[in-house]
Amino acid sequence: MDDDIAALVVDNGSGMCKAGFAGDDAPRAVFPSIVGRPRHQGVMVGMGQKDSYVGDEAQSKRGILTLKYPIEHGIVTNWDDMEKIWHHTFYNELRIAPEEHPVLLTEAPLNPKANREKMTQIMFETFNSPAMYVAIQAVLSLYASGRTTGIVMDSGDGVTHTVPIYEGYALPHAILRLDLAGRDLTDYLMKILTERGYSFTTTAEREIVRDIKEKLCYVALDFEQEMGTAASSSSLEKSYELPDGQVITIGNERFRCPEALFQPSFLGMESCGIHETTYNSIMKCDVDIRKDLYANTVLSGGTTMYPGIADRMQKEITALAPSTMKIKIIAPPERKYSVWIGGSILASLSTFQQMWISKQEYDESGPSIVHRKCF
């Protein structure tokens, strides 16, 4: 497919926006879903200061900006900022005219219906898209792994969900959603670093903590044992250099932070951990298909990138499942982008071309068309 008519695939995550062309094997643009506004008054005339910055530019100027994420827990909370992010995606990152390309957007399962209606409306009315489609993120991850059956545990920055899919059919009654994901872990790391005497409070400092989390955290196979190791020796300590040259040391925080995925009580939440949520999701499915789901548990999303997470999932689910059950956790190396890759695959299938919602259909039916045409 040529770029001139290629469909666009935009995976709008709560934390990162991944965008590119259908048929490509990786997104061309990956940038933080952030809009930043200056905290201070501009004094130098002719500097061309803007009243808002998006993505990487906001990230690089974060010291003087207040950063806001327009998507929280997978749901758009600020549509004006969201429009800025899409505008930035089309015109600055991909450098295309949105009115010339069909666009595939992604969404978390169990999102409010109004969310996808508004997405549809903005695409057709603000950007004049010729056609669009909204796909469920976890389903795309399964496409990317080359399977038609499996349970996807997709955990990003804003939301974690488990979606069982059998022979290409998602089983909506068994989809479970957990509003605990990367951003909550970043906040938790900010909190436990404060106990060590390092203070991180502003929206800009939160980004530093996110970087610490991504570079140094890992999941312990046995939490209690690891805590013992950390207490008795300094073998687990790592140092991190802050932007001003100060060096901080972190020890048990490295695995205490992602442990909250398995023990949400760390965050004061009463929900089940990701292992139990996955198990509960499987148990909501028909008894005949559970075996196939246990053997095809696919991890996807940035929050599944911690070293050790697949082994820990294997251990925890083995403990919950029947003792003879074969359990396989699939953690593809590109899982950070597997939603986008799945979107790229889907949008370039010849059989998918009749699934697009066209501008004409939208004009006839209005935004509610999205519920009829997109699963």
Curated annotation (Swiss-Prot):
<feature type="modified residue" description="Methionine (R)-sulfoxide">
    <location>
        <position position="47"/>
    </location>
</feature>
<dbReference type="GO" id="GO:0097433">
    <property type="term" value="C:dense body"/>
</dbReference>
<dbReference type="GO" id="GO:0005524">
    <property type="term" value="F:ATP binding"/>
</dbReference>
<comment type="similarity">
    <text>Belongs to the actin family.</text>
</comment>
<dbReference type="GO" id="GO:0005634">
    <property type="term" value="C:nucleus"/>
</dbReference>
<dbReference type="GO" id="GO:0015629">
    <property type="term" value="C:actin cytoskeleton"/>
</dbReference>
<keyword id="KW-0488">Methylation</keyword>
<dbReference type="InterPro" id="IPR004000">
    <property type="entry name" value="Actin"/>
</dbReference>
<feature type="modified residue" description="Tele-methylhistidine">
    <location>
        <position position="73"/>
    </location>
</feature>
<dbReference type="GO" id="GO:0005856">
    <property type="term" value="C:cytoskeleton"/>
</dbReference>
<dbReference type="InterPro" id="IPR004001">
    <property type="entry name" value="Actin_CS"/>
</dbReference>
<dbReference type="GO" id="GO:0005886">
    <property type="term" value="C:plasma membrane"/>
</dbReference>
<dbReference type="InterPro" id="IPR043129">
    <property type="entry name" value="ATPase_NBD"/>
</dbReference>
<keyword id="KW-0539">Nucleus</keyword>
<keyword id="KW-0007">Acetylation</keyword>
<comment type="subunit">
    <text>Polymerization of globular actin (G-actin) leads to a structural filament (F-actin) in the form of a two-stranded helix. Each actin can bind to 4 others.</text>
</comment>
<keyword id="KW-0378">Hydrolase</keyword>
<feature type="modified residue" description="N-acetylaspartate; in Actin, cytoplasmic 1, N-terminally processed">
    <location>
        <position position="2"/>
    </location>
</feature>
<dbReference type="InterPro" id="IPR020902">
    <property type="entry name" value="Actin/actin-like_CS"/>
</dbReference>
<dbReference type="Pfam" id="PF00022">
    <property type="entry name" value="Actin"/>
</dbReference>
<keyword id="KW-0963">Cytoplasm</keyword>
<protein>
    <recommendedName>
        <fullName>Actin, cytoplasmic 1</fullName>
        <ecNumber>3.6.4.-</ecNumber>
    </recommendedName>
</protein>
<feature type="modified residue" description="N-acetylmethionine; in Actin, cytoplasmic 1; alternate">
    <location>
        <position position="1"/>
    </location>
</feature>
<keyword id="KW-0558">Oxidation</keyword>
<feature type="modified residue" description="Methionine (R)-sulfoxide">
    <location>
        <position position="44"/>
    </location>
</feature>
<comment type="function">
    <text>Actin is a highly conserved protein that polymerizes to produce filaments that form cross-linked networks in the cytoplasm of cells. Actin exists in both monomeric (G-actin) and polymeric (F-actin) forms, both forms playing key functions, such as cell motility and contraction. In addition to their role in the cytoplasmic cytoskeleton, G- and F-actin also localize in the nucleus, and regulate gene transcription and motility and repair of damaged DNA.</text>
</comment>
<dbReference type="GO" id="GO:0005925">
    <property type="term" value="C:focal adhesion"/>
</dbReference>
<dbReference type="GO" id="GO:0016787">
    <property type="term" value="F:hydrolase activity"/>
</dbReference>
<keyword id="KW-0206">Cytoskeleton</keyword>
<keyword id="KW-0067">ATP-binding</keyword>
<keyword id="KW-0547">Nucleotide-binding</keyword>
